[in-house]
């Protein structure tokens, strides 16, 4: 059987020695999305992530895997990388053909269009410990996993998957290859990348935060928005506060990537108009060294009041000058 991604990666076992001991957890993920519109049209795109950083990209329209980092080759020589890439190329052609055969076998229970996602890799822990995973989603829903020595249908997945899973598990060669992939290949390849990309992975970028407001969908309410951008790594804590009290109505949106591989996040709070006084947005991030960012909503309003005050003072001064000039001219005319 050739259903599985990266089956020939067992050859990697000859490549690496021991890497430096890491100080934090990282996730290494190989992601694949395959779409089959019909028996004659399909598309497969893949990428590899180490932590939050993308290290490789493979478009359906490209015959070769693209590096997205200078260190994406890890500890592999050029020859070793070319050999690996060829294995991936053989795999992609085989995967497409095997899925088409699977659809024929399962028809009419399942038919086109079909969407399949694969996620495989490992969680890496300090001390060279790791835990690998291999998950498969069908039509956008988690359906199959590889655990121990066999493939398993997950709870809630359609029962018709039992047949292809039985076929897969009967192929002892494939099962052994997947075990090698998960137990040896992924952890060693990932640690080679970790060592090569250490400086990028350990960088710290401080967040920038600012406040704004938008009309709320609720009548008489205002939605306060705390924007946080430009931070790396991804974990961040953002909360609306009143004094020391966290505002449980705080809603945090999705993390959005910036072009420079930093992140953006916003936290909103819906309040009654006039109740925003005394609120503040608090931001915690590893790059801040414990010096949290605290933005007070009242302080945001201060510049507006200050501007109004300055304008009023200027009007008074201008008025006084005009009055002084007018009095001087009047006095001069009286003398004449």
From Swiss-Prot:
A motif (Internalization signal) lies at residues 332-335. The keyword Electron transport does not apply. Residues 207-297 form the Ig-like domain. Residues 22-305 are extracellular. Expressed on cortical thymocytes, on certain T-cell leukemias, and in various other tissues. One of its GO terms (cellular component) is external side of plasma membrane. This is Antigen-presenting glycoprotein CD1d2. It comes from Mus musculus. The gene is Cd1d2.
């Amino acid at each position: 059987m050739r259903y599985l991604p990266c089956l020939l990666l067992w050859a990697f076992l000859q490549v690496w020695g021991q890497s430096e001991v890491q100080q934090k957890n990282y996730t290494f993920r190989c992601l694949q999305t395959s779409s089959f519109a019909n028996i004659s049209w399909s598309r497969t795109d893949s990428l590899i992530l180490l932590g939050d950083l993308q290290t490789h990209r493979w478009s359906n329209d490209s015959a070769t895997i693209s590096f997205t980092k200078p260190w994406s080759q890890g500890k592999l020589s050029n020859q070793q990388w070319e050999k690996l890439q060829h294995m991936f190329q053989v795999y992609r052609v085989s995967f497409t053909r095997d899925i088409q055969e699977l659809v024929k076998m399962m028809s009419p229970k399942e038919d086109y269009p079909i969407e399949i996602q694969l996620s495989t890799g490992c969680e890496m822990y300090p001390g060279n410990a790791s835990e690998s995973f291999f998950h498969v989603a069908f039509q956008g829903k988690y359906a199959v996993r590889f655990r121990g020595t066999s493939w398993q249908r997950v709870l809630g997945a359609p029962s018709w998957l039992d047949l292809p899973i039985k076929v897969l598990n009967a192929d002892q060669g494939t099962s052994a290859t997947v075990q090698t992939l998960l137990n040896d290949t992924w952890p060693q390849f990932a640690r080679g990348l970790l060592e090569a990309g250490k400086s990028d992975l350990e960088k710290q970028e401080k967040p920038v935060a600012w406040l704004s407001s938008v009309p709320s969908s609720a009548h008489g309410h205002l939605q306060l928005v705390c924007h946080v951008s430009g931070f790396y790594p991804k974990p961040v804590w953002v909360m609306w506060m009143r004094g020391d009290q966290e505002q449980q109505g705080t809603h945090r949106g999705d993390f959005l990537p910036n072009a420079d591989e930093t992140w953006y996040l916003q936290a909103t709070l819906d309040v009654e108009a006039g109740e925003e006084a005394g609120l503040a947005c608090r931001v915690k991030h590893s790059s801040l060294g414990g010096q949290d960012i605290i933005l007070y909503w009242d302080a945001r309003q201060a510049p507006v009041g200050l501007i109004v005050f300055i304008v009023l003072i200027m009007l008074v001064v201008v008025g006084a000058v005009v009055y002084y000039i007018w009095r001087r001219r009047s006095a001069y005319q009286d003398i004449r």
